[in-house]
From Swiss-Prot:
Ca(2+) 1 binds at D81, D83, D85, E92. It comes from the Eukaryota. A motif (Prevents secretion from ER) lies at residues 312-315. Belongs to the CREC family. Ca(2+) 4 binds at D201, N203, D205, E212. This is Calumenin-B. Residues 1-19 form the signal peptide. It comes from Danio rerio.
Length: 315
């Protein structure tokens, strides 16, 4: 039975304890690129195809005729148009692109879902998750490596309640996804920051000082000489992380560190697709406008809708 995030936490700590002291831990969350292709529309639309469909779904472009491609693109457009008003806005396009890029996450959640929806009611309640993850462990003594399973359960419960937007103590598929992958959801960012601070803050003052910051990344293990990157991180803390120069990082400073305001690739791509396809320049797209530019969205030779559309229910 899969157990997340407990097994992940255990594995992470094992890796942490066995890591070489020269290795650096990175807690910063960056958005993955929409595509590894160059974004050069004068050359081809490969980047746009991968951004719109997801990289796995855009690998092959020789399976469908243009007519089939247009028909299936039309089905996707109906899903992008969330309010069913007949138009696709830039925000709807942005959300679709983010959804397509999260495909691997949703597949992971599907696997977890099978292990935790014990009564098959299409929800995972906190009790179901707790029983499946901690049921047999709580009766055992905590291991010598410092794990406290009751504390971990309390922390998971707090995260579960944060993900549970309607407060009914049971998660639908989207809420369960937010619980398992909080860094992917804006409304879960506070819990990501809080959990990070709790991990690093060893003296319990609710802040991260320089020693705690460095200690989380680097363990000296008797070696008197520090690698150069440790010196650089000390300078980063003093000059950039600690913005108010009080020698410690608070919640806002920690957020700026681990959740930097990266360039929003999905938003930029959504605006690009809208600009290129909006024939009447009204700031929104009709299904016909998108289908007319199907070569931009999915390719002129038929695309890997084999996956993206045959499996359209996942979207």
């Amino acid at each position: 039975m899969e157990q997340w995030p407990l097994l992940f936490v255990v594995a992470l700590c094992i890796l942490q304890s066995s890591s070489k002291p020269m290795e650096k831990k990175d807690r910063v969350h960056h958005d993955a690129p929409l595509s590894n292709k160059d974004h050069d529309d004068e050359e081809n639309f490969d980047y746009d195809h991968e951004a719109f469909l997801g990289q796995e779904e855009a690998k092959t472009f020789d399976q469908l005729t243009p007519e089939e491609s247009k028909e299936r693109l039309g089905k996707i457009v109906e899903k992008i148009d969330e309010d069913h008003d007949g138009f696709v806005t830039a925000d709807e396009m942005k959300r679709w692109i983010k959804h397509a890029q999260r495909r691997w996450i949703y597949e992971d959640v599907d696997r977890q879902w099978q292990a935790h929806d014990l009564n098959s009611d299409s929800f995972v309640s906190w009790e179901e998750y707790k029983d499946a993850t901690y049921g047999y462990i709580l009766d055992e003594a905590d291991p010598e490596d410092g794990f406290n399973y009751r504390q971990m359960m309390t922390r998971d419960e707090r995260r579960f309640k944060m993900a549970d937007q309607d407060g009914d103590l049971r998660a639908n598929k989207e809420e369960f996804t937010a619980f398992l992958h909080p860094e992917e959801f804006d409304y879960m960012k506070d819990i990501v920051v809080l959990e990070t601070m709790e991990d690093i803050d060893k003296n319990g003052d609710g802040l991260i000082d320089l020693n705690e910051y460095i200690g989380d990344m680097y363990s000296q293990n008797g070696d008197s000489s520090e690698p150069e990157w440790v010196k650089t991180e000390r300078e980063q803390f003093t000059e950039f992380r600690d913005k108010n120069k009080d020698g410690r990082m608070d919640k806002d400073e920690t957020r700026d560190w681990i959740l930097p305001a990266d360039y929003d690739h999905a938003e930029a791509e959504a605006k690009h697709l809208l600009y290129e396809s909006d024939a009447d320049k009204d700031g929104r797209l009709t299904k016909q406008e998108i289908v007319d530019k199907y070569d931009l969205f999915v390719g002129s030779q038929a695309t890997d809708f084999g996956d993206a559309l045959v499996r359209h229910d996942e979207f």
